[in-house]
Protein backbone atom coordinates (compact mmCIF):
# COMPACT_ATOMS: atom_id res chain seq x y z
CA UNK A 1 0.00 0.00 0.00
CA UNK A 2 2.76 2.37 0.93
CA UNK A 3 4.77 1.40 -2.15
CA UNK A 4 1.75 1.95 -4.41
CA UNK A 5 1.19 5.36 -2.78
CA UNK A 6 4.82 6.34 -3.29
CA UNK A 7 4.73 5.34 -6.97
CA UNK A 8 1.54 7.32 -7.51
CA UNK A 9 2.95 10.31 -5.69
CA UNK A 10 6.19 10.25 -7.68
CA UNK A 11 4.26 9.92 -10.96
CA UNK A 12 2.06 12.88 -10.03
CA UNK A 13 5.09 14.99 -9.13
CA UNK A 14 6.77 14.17 -12.47
CA UNK A 15 3.64 15.12 -14.40
CA UNK A 16 3.35 18.38 -12.48
CA UNK A 17 6.98 19.19 -13.17
CA UNK A 18 6.51 18.62 -16.90
CA UNK A 19 3.40 20.79 -16.86
CA UNK A 20 5.24 23.56 -15.08
CA UNK A 21 8.04 23.44 -17.63
CA UNK A 22 5.71 23.73 -20.64
CA UNK A 23 3.03 25.93 -19.09
CA UNK A 24 4.69 29.29 -19.85
CA UNK A 25 5.00 28.44 -23.54
CA UNK A 26 1.45 27.12 -23.66
CA UNK A 27 0.00 30.16 -21.91
CA UNK A 28 1.97 32.51 -24.22
CA UNK A 29 0.46 30.78 -27.21
CA UNK A 30 -3.00 31.31 -25.78
CA UNK A 31 -2.61 34.93 -24.66
CA UNK A 32 0.60 36.57 -25.84
CA UNK A 33 1.84 39.41 -23.70
CA UNK A 34 3.20 42.62 -25.17
CA UNK A 35 6.88 43.33 -24.70
CA UNK A 36 7.66 46.34 -22.60
CA UNK A 37 9.67 48.97 -24.44
CA UNK A 38 11.60 49.75 -21.30
CA UNK A 39 13.19 46.30 -21.56
CA UNK A 40 15.06 47.26 -24.72
CA UNK A 41 15.08 51.03 -25.08
CA UNK A 42 14.27 54.27 -23.31
CA UNK A 43 11.08 55.90 -24.50
CA UNK A 44 10.11 59.46 -23.73
CA UNK A 45 8.76 62.79 -24.92
CA UNK A 46 10.09 66.20 -25.88
CA UNK A 47 9.12 68.71 -23.23
CA UNK A 48 9.42 72.41 -22.50
CA UNK A 49 8.97 72.71 -18.71
CA UNK A 50 6.30 75.24 -17.70
CA UNK A 51 7.43 78.26 -15.71
CA UNK A 52 5.17 77.24 -12.83
CA UNK A 53 7.00 74.69 -10.61
CA UNK A 54 3.78 72.93 -9.61
CA UNK A 55 2.67 72.57 -13.23
CA UNK A 56 6.10 71.28 -14.22
CA UNK A 57 6.11 68.63 -11.48
CA UNK A 58 2.57 67.57 -12.33
CA UNK A 59 3.41 67.12 -16.01
CA UNK A 60 6.60 65.21 -15.20
CA UNK A 61 4.65 62.77 -13.03
CA UNK A 62 2.09 62.29 -15.80
CA UNK A 63 4.91 61.43 -18.21
CA UNK A 64 6.10 58.75 -15.83
CA UNK A 65 2.55 57.46 -15.52
CA UNK A 66 2.21 56.87 -19.27
CA UNK A 67 5.42 54.83 -19.26
CA UNK A 68 8.08 57.36 -20.24
CA UNK A 69 11.56 56.53 -18.96
CA UNK A 70 13.33 59.52 -20.53
CA UNK A 71 12.53 63.16 -21.24
CA UNK A 72 14.20 65.49 -23.69
CA UNK A 73 13.99 69.04 -22.37
CA UNK A 74 14.29 72.04 -24.67
CA UNK A 75 15.57 74.23 -21.84
CA UNK A 76 17.32 73.93 -18.50
CA UNK A 77 15.07 72.36 -15.83
CA UNK A 78 14.70 73.85 -12.34
CA UNK A 79 16.16 72.00 -9.40
CA UNK A 80 12.75 70.73 -8.28
CA UNK A 81 12.11 69.08 -11.65
CA UNK A 82 15.51 67.38 -11.63
CA UNK A 83 14.92 66.16 -8.08
CA UNK A 84 11.55 64.68 -8.99
CA UNK A 85 13.11 63.02 -12.04
CA UNK A 86 15.59 61.37 -9.67
CA UNK A 87 12.79 59.82 -7.65
CA UNK A 88 10.87 58.75 -10.75
CA UNK A 89 13.91 57.10 -12.31
CA UNK A 90 13.81 59.23 -15.45
CA UNK A 91 16.72 60.08 -17.72
CA UNK A 92 16.90 63.73 -18.69
CA UNK A 93 18.31 64.86 -22.03
CA UNK A 94 18.75 68.64 -21.95
CA UNK A 95 19.17 70.77 -25.09
CA UNK A 96 21.41 73.81 -25.07
CA UNK A 97 19.89 76.94 -26.70
CA UNK A 98 21.68 76.35 -30.03
CA UNK A 99 19.14 75.95 -32.79
CA UNK A 100 19.36 75.99 -36.62
CA UNK A 101 22.87 77.41 -36.78
CA UNK A 102 25.14 77.32 -39.86
CA UNK A 103 28.68 76.05 -39.47
CA UNK A 104 30.50 79.44 -39.27
CA UNK A 105 28.22 80.58 -36.42
CA UNK A 106 28.21 77.39 -34.34
CA UNK A 107 31.30 78.19 -32.26
CA UNK A 108 29.93 81.61 -31.27
CA UNK A 109 26.51 80.14 -30.51
CA UNK A 110 28.01 77.49 -28.23
CA UNK A 111 30.19 80.11 -26.53
CA UNK A 112 27.05 82.13 -25.76
CA UNK A 113 25.43 78.97 -24.38
CA UNK A 114 28.45 78.15 -22.18
CA UNK A 115 26.88 79.67 -19.01
CA UNK A 116 23.85 77.43 -19.52
CA UNK A 117 26.16 74.44 -19.88
CA UNK A 118 27.94 75.28 -16.63
CA UNK A 119 24.62 75.60 -14.78
CA UNK A 120 23.54 72.28 -16.25
CA UNK A 121 26.73 70.57 -15.10
CA UNK A 122 26.28 72.00 -11.62
CA UNK A 123 22.73 70.68 -11.60
CA UNK A 124 23.88 67.28 -12.86
CA UNK A 125 26.34 66.96 -9.96
CA UNK A 126 23.36 66.94 -7.59
CA UNK A 127 20.93 64.98 -9.74
CA UNK A 128 21.94 61.72 -11.45
CA UNK A 129 18.83 61.85 -13.65
CA UNK A 130 20.59 64.41 -15.90
CA UNK A 131 22.64 62.18 -18.18
CA UNK A 132 22.87 63.89 -21.59
CA UNK A 133 23.42 67.37 -22.95
CA UNK A 134 22.40 68.39 -26.47
CA UNK A 135 25.02 70.61 -28.08
CA UNK A 136 22.91 71.68 -31.05
CA UNK A 137 19.59 71.17 -32.80
CA UNK A 138 19.48 71.24 -36.61
CA UNK A 139 22.99 72.64 -36.97
CA UNK A 140 24.68 72.29 -40.34
CA UNK A 141 26.22 68.89 -39.67
CA UNK A 142 26.83 68.30 -43.38
CA UNK A 143 30.17 70.17 -43.33
CA UNK A 144 33.42 69.17 -41.54
CA UNK A 145 33.73 72.57 -39.83
CA UNK A 146 30.69 71.78 -37.70
CA UNK A 147 32.12 68.38 -36.76
CA UNK A 148 35.33 69.91 -35.44
CA UNK A 149 33.37 72.36 -33.30
CA UNK A 150 31.15 69.64 -31.87
CA UNK A 151 34.16 67.43 -31.19
CA UNK A 152 35.92 70.20 -29.21
CA UNK A 153 32.84 70.86 -27.10
CA UNK A 154 32.32 67.16 -26.47
CA UNK A 155 35.86 66.97 -25.13
CA UNK A 156 35.14 70.02 -22.98
CA UNK A 157 32.05 68.35 -21.51
CA UNK A 158 33.99 65.15 -20.83
CA UNK A 159 36.93 66.99 -19.28
CA UNK A 160 35.22 67.80 -15.98
CA UNK A 161 32.69 65.96 -13.83
CA UNK A 162 29.93 64.97 -13.98
CA UNK A 163 30.29 62.53 -16.86
CA UNK A 164 27.57 63.84 -19.14
CA UNK A 165 27.16 62.35 -22.60
CA UNK A 166 26.73 64.64 -25.59
CA UNK A 167 24.32 64.50 -28.51
CA UNK A 168 22.96 66.65 -31.29
CA UNK A 169 19.58 66.54 -33.00
CA UNK A 170 19.67 66.44 -36.78
CA UNK A 171 17.06 66.43 -39.55
CA UNK A 172 19.61 65.41 -42.20
CA UNK A 173 19.74 62.05 -43.94
CA UNK A 174 22.53 59.64 -43.06
CA UNK A 175 24.20 60.11 -46.44
CA UNK A 176 24.49 63.87 -45.87
CA UNK A 177 25.39 64.09 -42.18
CA UNK A 178 29.11 63.85 -41.35
CA UNK A 179 29.37 64.46 -37.62
CA UNK A 180 28.13 61.26 -35.99
CA UNK A 181 31.57 60.49 -34.53
CA UNK A 182 31.92 63.98 -33.02
CA UNK A 183 29.45 63.30 -30.18
CA UNK A 184 28.39 60.38 -28.03
CA UNK A 185 24.98 60.01 -29.62
CA UNK A 186 22.96 61.34 -32.55
CA UNK A 187 19.22 61.94 -32.29
CA UNK A 188 17.11 62.20 -35.42
CA UNK A 189 14.43 64.82 -35.96
CA UNK A 190 11.94 62.93 -38.13
CA UNK A 191 8.82 64.99 -37.47
CA UNK A 192 6.43 64.67 -40.37
CA UNK A 193 8.62 62.15 -42.17
CA UNK A 194 6.50 59.59 -44.05
CA UNK A 195 8.73 56.70 -42.92
CA UNK A 196 10.57 57.73 -39.72
CA UNK A 197 11.67 54.22 -38.78
CA UNK A 198 13.15 53.64 -42.23
CA UNK A 199 15.13 56.86 -41.83
CA UNK A 200 16.44 55.61 -38.47
CA UNK A 201 17.41 52.23 -39.96
CA UNK A 202 19.35 53.97 -42.71
CA UNK A 203 21.24 55.80 -40.00
CA UNK A 204 21.61 52.61 -37.96
CA UNK A 205 23.51 51.01 -40.83
CA UNK A 206 26.06 53.85 -40.57
CA UNK A 207 26.41 54.22 -36.79
CA UNK A 208 25.15 52.36 -33.75
CA UNK A 209 24.79 55.38 -31.46
CA UNK A 210 21.69 56.87 -33.05
CA UNK A 211 18.24 57.35 -31.56
CA UNK A 212 15.04 59.15 -32.40
CA UNK A 213 15.01 62.69 -31.05
CA UNK A 214 11.60 63.82 -32.30
CA UNK A 215 8.93 61.53 -33.76
CA UNK A 216 5.46 62.74 -34.64
CA UNK A 217 3.31 64.69 -37.03
CA UNK A 218 1.37 67.87 -36.62
CA UNK A 219 -2.28 68.52 -35.89
CA UNK A 220 -3.94 71.33 -37.79
CA UNK A 221 -6.25 73.29 -35.46
CA UNK A 222 -8.89 73.69 -38.17
CA UNK A 223 -8.93 69.98 -39.10
CA UNK A 224 -12.18 68.10 -38.59
CA UNK A 225 -12.04 65.08 -36.25
CA UNK A 226 -11.64 61.61 -37.69
CA UNK A 227 -9.13 59.52 -39.61
CA UNK A 228 -10.43 60.74 -42.96
CA UNK A 229 -9.43 64.31 -42.21
CA UNK A 230 -5.76 65.17 -42.94
CA UNK A 231 -3.79 66.29 -39.89
CA UNK A 232 -6.62 65.59 -37.47
CA UNK A 233 -5.87 64.47 -33.89
CA UNK A 234 -6.83 60.93 -34.91
CA UNK A 235 -4.41 60.98 -37.83
CA UNK A 236 -1.65 62.08 -35.45
CA UNK A 237 -2.47 59.14 -33.18
CA UNK A 238 -2.44 56.69 -36.10
CA UNK A 239 0.92 58.04 -37.27
CA UNK A 240 2.46 57.42 -33.83
CA UNK A 241 0.84 53.99 -33.58
CA UNK A 242 2.42 52.87 -36.84
CA UNK A 243 5.78 54.46 -36.17
CA UNK A 244 6.24 53.25 -32.61
CA UNK A 245 4.88 49.77 -33.29
CA UNK A 246 7.51 49.22 -35.98
CA UNK A 247 10.19 49.63 -33.33
CA UNK A 248 9.17 46.23 -31.93
CA UNK A 249 10.14 44.27 -35.02
CA UNK A 250 11.63 41.16 -33.42
CA UNK A 251 14.13 40.75 -36.26
CA UNK A 252 15.78 44.12 -35.60
CA UNK A 253 17.17 45.85 -32.55
CA UNK A 254 15.31 48.99 -31.41
CA UNK A 255 17.00 52.38 -30.98
CA UNK A 256 18.61 53.16 -27.63
CA UNK A 257 16.19 56.05 -27.08
CA UNK A 258 13.13 57.49 -28.81
CA UNK A 259 11.25 60.69 -28.05
CA UNK A 260 7.77 61.63 -29.20
CA UNK A 261 7.42 65.26 -30.19
CA UNK A 262 6.01 66.68 -28.06
CA UNK A 263 4.23 66.67 -24.68
CA UNK A 264 2.36 69.96 -25.13
CA UNK A 265 1.92 72.40 -28.01
CA UNK A 266 4.50 75.14 -28.26
CA UNK A 267 3.33 78.60 -27.26
CA UNK A 268 4.84 80.26 -30.34
CA UNK A 269 5.44 77.66 -33.06
CA UNK A 270 7.14 78.56 -36.31
CA UNK A 271 3.88 77.80 -38.13
CA UNK A 272 0.77 78.31 -36.03
CA UNK A 273 -1.05 75.71 -38.15
CA UNK A 274 1.28 72.95 -36.93
CA UNK A 275 0.68 71.61 -33.42
CA UNK A 276 2.77 68.59 -32.45
CA UNK A 277 1.70 68.17 -28.83
CA UNK A 278 0.11 65.15 -27.21
CA UNK A 279 -1.78 67.90 -25.39
CA UNK A 280 -2.91 71.28 -26.64
CA UNK A 281 -1.66 74.52 -25.12
CA UNK A 282 -4.40 74.38 -22.46
CA UNK A 283 -3.40 70.88 -21.37
CA UNK A 284 -6.29 68.96 -22.95
CA UNK A 285 -5.11 65.57 -24.15
CA UNK A 286 -5.35 64.32 -27.72
CA UNK A 287 -5.97 60.69 -28.80
CA UNK A 288 -2.22 60.23 -29.30
CA UNK A 289 -1.79 60.13 -25.51
CA UNK A 290 -3.62 56.81 -25.43
CA UNK A 291 -1.32 55.43 -28.11
CA UNK A 292 1.83 56.52 -26.31
CA UNK A 293 0.58 55.14 -22.99
CA UNK A 294 -0.35 51.77 -24.48
CA UNK A 295 2.93 51.29 -26.35
CA UNK A 296 5.19 52.71 -23.65
CA UNK A 297 3.66 50.54 -20.94
CA UNK A 298 3.40 47.50 -23.21
CA UNK A 299 -0.33 47.08 -22.56
CA UNK A 300 -1.74 47.87 -26.00
CA UNK A 301 -0.45 47.90 -29.55
CA UNK A 302 -3.61 48.21 -31.67
CA UNK A 303 -5.99 51.15 -31.40
CA UNK A 304 -9.30 52.12 -32.93
CA UNK A 305 -10.28 55.67 -33.82
CA UNK A 306 -13.42 57.09 -35.40
CA UNK A 307 -13.24 57.60 -39.14
CA UNK A 308 -15.23 60.80 -39.07
CA UNK A 309 -16.92 62.31 -42.06
CA UNK A 310 -15.22 62.53 -45.42
CA UNK A 311 -13.58 65.95 -45.78
CA UNK A 312 -15.30 68.41 -48.04
CA UNK A 313 -13.87 68.83 -51.50
CA UNK A 314 -11.49 71.75 -51.67
CA UNK A 315 -12.49 75.01 -53.27
CA UNK A 316 -12.21 75.20 -57.03
CA UNK A 317 -11.77 78.96 -56.98
CA UNK A 318 -8.04 78.91 -57.68
CA UNK A 319 -8.43 76.28 -60.38
CA UNK A 320 -11.17 78.29 -62.08
CA UNK A 321 -9.11 81.47 -61.81
CA UNK A 322 -6.03 79.82 -63.27
CA UNK A 323 -7.70 78.18 -66.22
CA UNK A 324 -9.86 81.26 -66.64
CA UNK A 325 -6.71 83.30 -67.20
CA UNK A 326 -5.51 80.73 -69.72
CA UNK A 327 -8.85 80.89 -71.52
CA UNK A 328 -8.79 84.69 -71.45
CA UNK A 329 -5.35 84.68 -73.03
CA UNK A 330 -6.62 82.42 -75.80
CA UNK A 331 -9.64 84.66 -76.31
CA UNK A 332 -7.46 87.77 -76.60
CA UNK A 333 -5.30 86.01 -79.16
CA UNK A 334 -8.31 84.87 -81.17
CA UNK A 335 -10.16 88.21 -81.15
CA UNK A 336 -7.30 90.72 -81.47
CA UNK A 337 -5.53 91.08 -84.82
CA UNK A 338 -2.91 93.26 -83.12
CA UNK A 339 -2.04 90.48 -80.68
CA UNK A 340 -1.74 87.86 -83.43
CA UNK A 341 0.48 90.10 -85.56
CA UNK A 342 2.65 91.08 -82.60
CA UNK A 343 3.11 87.43 -81.61
CA UNK A 344 4.35 86.65 -85.11
CA UNK A 345 6.69 89.64 -85.17
CA UNK A 346 7.99 89.12 -81.63
CA UNK A 347 8.99 85.48 -82.06
CA UNK A 348 9.83 85.24 -85.77
CA UNK A 349 10.81 88.77 -86.87
CA UNK A 350 12.10 90.77 -83.89
CA UNK A 351 13.37 93.51 -86.21
CA UNK A 352 9.85 94.21 -87.48
CA UNK A 353 8.61 94.09 -83.87
CA UNK A 354 11.08 96.82 -82.88
CA UNK A 355 10.22 98.91 -85.94
CA UNK A 356 6.54 98.82 -85.04
CA UNK A 357 7.38 99.67 -81.45
CA UNK A 358 9.57 102.59 -82.55
CA UNK A 359 6.86 104.03 -84.79
CA UNK A 360 4.28 103.75 -82.02
CA UNK A 361 1.17 103.46 -84.22
CA UNK A 362 -1.86 101.29 -83.42
CA UNK A 363 -0.37 99.83 -80.23
CA UNK A 364 -3.79 99.02 -78.71
CA UNK A 365 -3.14 100.03 -75.06
CA UNK A 366 -6.30 98.21 -73.95
CA UNK A 367 -5.11 94.85 -75.25
CA UNK A 368 -1.67 95.36 -73.73
CA UNK A 369 -3.16 96.39 -70.40
CA UNK A 370 -5.24 93.20 -70.47
CA UNK A 371 -2.11 91.17 -71.18
CA UNK A 372 -0.40 92.87 -68.24
CA UNK A 373 -3.35 91.88 -66.06
CA UNK A 374 -3.04 88.27 -67.23
CA UNK A 375 0.69 88.27 -66.39
CA UNK A 376 0.04 89.73 -62.94
CA UNK A 377 -2.82 87.29 -62.33
CA UNK A 378 -0.66 84.35 -63.40
CA UNK A 379 2.05 85.39 -60.96
CA UNK A 380 -0.47 85.79 -58.15
CA UNK A 381 -2.11 82.42 -58.80
CA UNK A 382 1.30 80.74 -58.96
CA UNK A 383 2.16 82.32 -55.61
CA UNK A 384 -1.03 80.93 -54.07
CA UNK A 385 -0.23 77.43 -55.34
CA UNK A 386 3.34 77.66 -54.05
CA UNK A 387 2.19 78.79 -50.59
CA UNK A 388 -0.33 75.96 -50.34
CA UNK A 389 2.23 73.37 -51.33
CA UNK A 390 4.76 74.79 -48.87
CA UNK A 391 2.20 74.60 -46.07
CA UNK A 392 1.98 70.83 -46.53
CA UNK A 393 5.72 70.05 -46.68
CA UNK A 394 7.64 69.10 -43.49
CA UNK A 395 10.80 70.74 -44.84
CA UNK A 396 9.12 74.17 -44.86
CA UNK A 397 9.24 74.42 -41.09
CA UNK A 398 12.94 73.62 -40.96
CA UNK A 399 13.84 76.26 -43.53
CA UNK A 400 11.70 78.88 -41.79
CA UNK A 401 13.28 78.08 -38.42
CA UNK A 402 16.72 78.91 -39.84
CA UNK A 403 15.63 82.39 -40.95
CA UNK A 404 15.88 85.54 -38.81
CA UNK A 405 12.67 86.25 -36.84
CA UNK A 406 11.47 89.26 -38.90
CA UNK A 407 11.77 87.34 -42.16
CA UNK A 408 10.41 84.18 -40.56
CA UNK A 409 7.26 85.94 -39.35
CA UNK A 410 6.54 87.45 -42.77
CA UNK A 411 7.06 84.20 -44.69
CA UNK A 412 5.19 82.08 -42.14
CA UNK A 413 2.24 84.45 -42.29
CA UNK A 414 2.22 84.17 -46.06
CA UNK A 415 2.33 80.37 -46.01
CA UNK A 416 -0.58 80.30 -43.58
CA UNK A 417 -2.59 82.77 -45.73
CA UNK A 418 -1.99 81.79 -49.37
CA UNK A 419 -4.53 84.25 -50.81
CA UNK A 420 -2.58 87.08 -49.21
CA UNK A 421 0.57 85.76 -50.88
CA UNK A 422 -1.14 85.87 -54.26
CA UNK A 423 -2.37 89.42 -53.76
CA UNK A 424 1.03 90.63 -52.53
CA UNK A 425 2.98 88.95 -55.35
CA UNK A 426 0.59 90.23 -57.99
CA UNK A 427 0.63 93.73 -56.51
CA UNK A 428 4.42 93.78 -56.26
CA UNK A 429 4.77 92.60 -59.85
CA UNK A 430 2.40 95.31 -61.06
CA UNK A 431 4.13 97.99 -59.00
CA UNK A 432 7.67 97.02 -59.98
CA UNK A 433 6.85 96.70 -63.67
CA UNK A 434 5.01 100.01 -63.55
CA UNK A 435 7.94 101.72 -61.82
CA UNK A 436 10.40 100.36 -64.36
CA UNK A 437 8.18 101.25 -67.30
CA UNK A 438 7.74 104.80 -66.00
CA UNK A 439 11.48 105.28 -65.64
CA UNK A 440 12.13 103.94 -69.15
CA UNK A 441 9.50 106.22 -70.69
CA UNK A 442 10.63 109.36 -68.86
CA UNK A 443 14.29 108.90 -69.78
CA UNK A 444 13.44 108.12 -73.42
CA UNK A 445 11.38 111.32 -73.68
CA UNK A 446 14.50 113.41 -73.12
CA UNK A 447 15.82 112.49 -76.55
CA UNK A 448 12.83 111.32 -78.61
CA UNK A 449 9.08 110.92 -78.66
CA UNK A 450 8.13 107.95 -76.53
CA UNK A 451 4.64 107.29 -75.15
CA UNK A 452 3.41 105.24 -72.23
CA UNK A 453 1.65 102.97 -74.75
CA UNK A 454 5.06 102.16 -76.23
CA UNK A 455 6.45 101.58 -72.75
CA UNK A 456 3.59 99.21 -71.99
CA UNK A 457 4.36 97.08 -75.06
CA UNK A 458 8.08 97.24 -74.28
CA UNK A 459 7.63 95.83 -70.76
CA UNK A 460 4.66 93.48 -71.16
CA UNK A 461 5.57 91.35 -74.16
CA UNK A 462 8.92 90.05 -72.85
CA UNK A 463 7.03 88.73 -69.80
CA UNK A 464 5.65 85.79 -71.77
CA UNK A 465 7.88 83.23 -69.88
CA UNK A 466 5.74 83.91 -66.82
CA UNK A 467 2.65 82.38 -68.43
CA UNK A 468 3.78 78.70 -68.44
CA UNK A 469 4.26 78.91 -64.67
CA UNK A 470 0.49 78.98 -64.16
CA UNK A 471 -0.46 75.58 -65.68
CA UNK A 472 2.64 74.06 -64.08
CA UNK A 473 1.52 75.34 -60.66
CA UNK A 474 -2.01 74.05 -61.17
CA UNK A 475 -0.62 70.60 -62.06
CA UNK A 476 1.63 70.38 -58.98
CA UNK A 477 0.84 68.53 -55.76
CA UNK A 478 1.64 65.45 -53.65
CA UNK A 479 -0.40 63.13 -55.90
CA UNK A 480 -0.35 65.32 -59.02
CA UNK A 481 1.70 64.91 -62.22
CA UNK A 482 4.29 67.38 -60.90
CA UNK A 483 5.67 66.66 -57.43
CA UNK A 484 6.18 69.52 -54.94
CA UNK A 485 9.96 69.13 -55.08
CA UNK A 486 10.00 69.26 -58.89
CA UNK A 487 7.68 72.26 -58.82
CA UNK A 488 9.97 74.06 -56.37
CA UNK A 489 12.95 73.35 -58.61
CA UNK A 490 11.10 74.57 -61.70
CA UNK A 491 9.84 77.64 -59.87
CA UNK A 492 13.28 78.58 -58.58
CA UNK A 493 15.32 77.80 -61.67
CA UNK A 494 12.71 78.82 -64.20
CA UNK A 495 11.88 81.98 -62.29
CA UNK A 496 15.50 83.13 -62.27
CA UNK A 497 15.92 82.38 -65.98
CA UNK A 498 12.67 84.19 -66.77
CA UNK A 499 13.77 87.26 -64.81
CA UNK A 500 17.10 87.37 -66.63
CA UNK A 501 15.38 86.97 -69.98
CA UNK A 502 12.79 89.69 -69.32
CA UNK A 503 15.43 92.14 -68.12
CA UNK A 504 17.81 91.49 -71.01
CA UNK A 505 15.10 91.59 -73.69
CA UNK A 506 13.50 94.80 -72.41
CA UNK A 507 16.84 96.60 -72.14
CA UNK A 508 18.00 95.42 -75.57
CA UNK A 509 14.75 96.46 -77.28
CA UNK A 510 14.84 99.77 -75.42
CA UNK A 511 18.42 100.44 -76.54
CA UNK A 512 17.57 99.50 -80.15
CA UNK A 513 14.57 101.84 -80.49
CA UNK A 514 15.80 104.86 -78.49
CA UNK A 515 19.47 105.09 -79.54
CA UNK A 516 20.39 105.98 -75.95
CA UNK A 517 23.95 105.29 -74.77
CA UNK A 518 24.55 101.80 -73.48
CA UNK A 519 25.64 103.14 -70.09
CA UNK A 520 22.31 104.90 -69.65
CA UNK A 521 20.40 101.76 -70.56
CA UNK A 522 22.42 99.69 -68.07
CA UNK A 523 21.73 102.23 -65.34
CA UNK A 524 18.01 101.91 -66.04
CA UNK A 525 18.44 98.17 -65.52
CA UNK A 526 19.03 98.94 -61.85
CA UNK A 527 15.30 99.67 -61.55
CA UNK A 528 14.26 96.34 -63.07
CA UNK A 529 12.35 93.86 -60.86
CA UNK A 530 15.33 91.48 -61.09
CA UNK A 531 17.79 94.09 -59.83
CA UNK A 532 15.52 95.38 -57.06
CA UNK A 533 14.65 91.86 -55.91
CA UNK A 534 18.29 90.79 -55.94
CA UNK A 535 19.25 93.89 -53.97
CA UNK A 536 16.61 93.11 -51.34
CA UNK A 537 17.77 89.50 -50.98
CA UNK A 538 21.41 90.60 -50.77
CA UNK A 539 20.57 93.19 -48.13
CA UNK A 540 18.64 90.70 -45.98
CA UNK A 541 21.30 87.98 -46.21
CA UNK A 542 24.04 90.48 -45.34
CA UNK A 543 22.15 92.27 -42.59
CA UNK A 544 21.01 89.09 -40.85
CA UNK A 545 24.03 86.97 -41.81
CA UNK A 546 21.88 84.31 -43.45
CA UNK A 547 23.66 81.33 -45.00
CA UNK A 548 22.02 80.56 -48.34
CA UNK A 549 24.01 77.31 -48.55
CA UNK A 550 22.64 76.16 -45.19
CA UNK A 551 19.07 76.95 -46.26
CA UNK A 552 19.60 75.01 -49.47
CA UNK A 553 20.89 71.98 -47.59
CA UNK A 554 17.95 72.11 -45.17
CA UNK A 555 15.58 72.19 -48.13
CA UNK A 556 17.21 69.40 -50.14
CA UNK A 557 18.98 67.03 -47.72
CA UNK A 558 16.37 66.51 -44.99
CA UNK A 559 13.41 65.01 -46.85
Model-derived features: where do they sit?
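Aromatic-lined substrate-binding rim segments of carbohydrate-active enzymes
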Residues: 59-63, 68-102, 149-164
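Hydrophobic alpha-helical transmembrane segments and adjacent short intramembrane/lumenal linkers
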Residues: 414-427, 435-543
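Glycoside hydrolase catalytic-domain groove-lining segments
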Residues: 175-226
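Active-site clefts of carbohydrate-active enzymes
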Residues: 206-240, 260-275
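Aromatic-lined carbohydrate-recognition surfaces of secreted/lumenal glycan-active proteins
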Residues: 154-175, 211-215, 259-262
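Aromatic-rich peripheral "rim/lid" segments of glycoside hydrolase catalytic domains that contact
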Residues: 261-311, 316-320
